């Protein structure tokens, strides 16, 4: 059974003005998402599911879905802040979506096969889809609790325009994920990758340290765990009082690997990540995509 690609497109870019999911960066106005879909189809993915905001539906159907319908099955699902389990209501004044794992939960009715989750506005690169596609395709029928995450080498994920935040991954001898620690202010200094540690000190980390760029591989049992744990998340008064609290994927994965329910293999990739973290990054992304097209990795049109 071919795996599904689940694209998270419900969030709006906070640091970069405009609907960055629809910003044309390729030579013919292709979006970053178009390149991800191209790479995914070549890596054996057989269906696309997009999670978006309902008010964005028409625009999205016209600009995105119309390109792919007829080539690959496509489904649209919607994330809204009022979509909560029975017994819970959205706190007054909350406008922020409930986070990436809440977005993932929206796919439960349409995804019955192994699937990968990606951000729409990150350029992950061909190799990352190949390693994830291979992992998901090799899972025996009916597999449960065997998850994965593409671990990008930190040196391949930096921005030339400023510092970045990344989830640094701890792994065991079998390449299974043991922890994800969010680090901020990461940049290359004096030829080394450094971040600010808990004591406010600059700390170096190897170029190959795996980091999470929100590229995950799951089996459908993940939806039931998420629905259950989301109730616990909402039952915590501090998550309801904080109007910006979010139910993130790493929070869910961390719980499942720590209580021994599931494993999550970290898949190494040589892909270089890039994205538009800052408006100043835009031109550099356009140039990098053009270079890949020139090198024959992507079609010119």
Where are these regions (language model features)?
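Conserved N-terminal catalytic core of the sugar/cofactor nucleotidyltransferase
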Residues: 1-10, 27-117, 124-131, 137-138
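Phosphate- and divalent-cation-binding pockets in alpha/beta enzyme and binding domains
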Residues: 59-60, 127, 225, 252, ...
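Conserved core of the sugar-phosphate nucleotidyltransferase
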Residues: 126-216, 220
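Catalytic beta-strand/loop signature of glycosyltransferases that borders the donor
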Residues: 210, 265-271
């Amino acid at each position: 059974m071919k795996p599904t690609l689940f694209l998270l497109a419900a969030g709006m870019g906070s640091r970069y003005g405009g609907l960055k999911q629809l910003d044309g960066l390729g030579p013919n106005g292709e979006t970053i998402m178009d390149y991800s879909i191209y790479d995914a189809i070549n890596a054996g993915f057989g269906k696309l599911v997009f999670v978006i905001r309902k008010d964005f539906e028409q625009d999205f159907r016209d600009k995105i879905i119309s390109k792919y319908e007829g080539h690959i099955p496509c489904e649209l699902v919607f994330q809204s802040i009022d979509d909560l389990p029975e017994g819970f209501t959205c706190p007054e004044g909350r406008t922020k979506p409930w986070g990436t794992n809440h977005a993932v939960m929206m796919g439960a009715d349409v995804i019955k096969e192994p699937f990968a989750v990606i951000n729409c506005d990150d350029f992950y690169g061909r190799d990352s889809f190949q390693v994830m596609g291979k992992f998901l395709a090799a899972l025996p029928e009916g597999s449960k609790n065997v998850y994965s995450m593409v671990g990008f080498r930190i040196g391949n994920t930096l921005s030339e325009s400023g510092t970045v935040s990344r989830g640094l991954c701890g792994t065991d001898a079998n390449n299974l994920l043991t922890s994800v620690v969010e680090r901020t202010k990461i940049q290359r200094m004096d030829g080394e990758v450094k971040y600010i540690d808990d004591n406010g000190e600059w700390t170096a980390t190897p170029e190959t340290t795996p980091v999470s760029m929100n590229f995950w591989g799951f089996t459908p049992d993940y939806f039931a765990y998420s629905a259950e744990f989301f109730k616990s998340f909402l039952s915590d008064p501090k998550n309801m009082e904080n109007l910006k609290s979010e139910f993130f994927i790493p929070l869910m994965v961390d719980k499942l690997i720590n209580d021994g329910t599931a494993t999550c293999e970290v898949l190494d990739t040589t892909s270089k990540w890039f994205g538009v973290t800052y408006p100043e990054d835009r031109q550099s992304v356009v140039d990098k995509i053009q270079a890949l097209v020139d090198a024959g990795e992507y079609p010119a049109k």
